[in-house]
Structure formats: structure tokens, C-alpha cells
Amino acid sequence: MVTANFAAIAGLSLIAVALVAVFFSPYRRWLGFMLAGMFFWGLLEVVRFGVQVTFEMPVTYSYLTALSLAMVMVTFVLLREDKQAQKALANRQYIEHTPVYEDDQQQCSSR
């Protein structure tokens, strides 16, 4: 059974107070970044543990492998986003060239 000593209770209460203070401050968006970072690190730990158990690697090499896989995935995501941004820019810059007639030319062609 886990026992809570005074230091653990004080530390967790200070973290809770800090989170509440940040939530009500103008820097609320930083909580999203913090949660995304914690989620990313959790996924990294899952990959590290899977690599360590599957290939029986030491902890150091499993961390290096997990970080390498994460960087490769981040690179692929960034390349995909860049390709989509370039495609959207090309679509915005595309101008369809249709003939423009002046009034005189339209009258002549209809006779």
C-alpha cells in the first residue's frame, strides 16, 4: 500500500495550486502544450518499454531507439504538413485564364 508523507502531500498540493493559477491566467494555452508534451512523453515511454522488452536492449539503447523513431515520425508529419501547405498555396495562386471580351468584340461576334 502506498503511504503519503508530508512531502508528497505538500508537493502535489503545490502542483495543483500552480495548475489552477495557470488555468485562470492569460497563459492558459500553455496548459495545452504541457498536456501535449506529457502525452508525447508517455507514448515515448510505451515505445521504449516495448523495444526494451522485445529486443532485450539496455535502457539507454531503448531510449535512443524510441527517440529516433519519434524523430522520424515527427519528420514525416512535418513533411506531410509542408506538402499540404504548398498544395494550398498553389491552389490559391492558380488563376484560370478565360478570354475577356470587350463590348465591341461581343457586338461584332453576335452579328
Swiss-Prot record:
Membrane topology: Multi-pass membrane protein
Keywords: Antibiotic resistance, Cell inner membrane, Cell membrane, Membrane, Transmembrane, Transmembrane helix
Protein's cellular compartments: Cell inner membrane
Swiss-Prot/TrEMBL GO biological process terms: response to antibiotic
Cytoplasmic side: 27-30, 80-111
Function: May play a role in cellular filamentation, especially in response to ciprofloxacin. Increased expression confers tolerance to the antibiotic ciprofloxacin.
Chief site of localization: membrane
Species in which this protein is naturally found: Acinetobacter baumannii
TM regions (residue ranges): 6-26, 31-51, 59-79
Segments in the Periplasmic topological domain: 1-5, 52-58
Cysteine pairs bridged by disulfides in the record: none
UniProt name for this protein: Ciprofloxacin tolerance protein
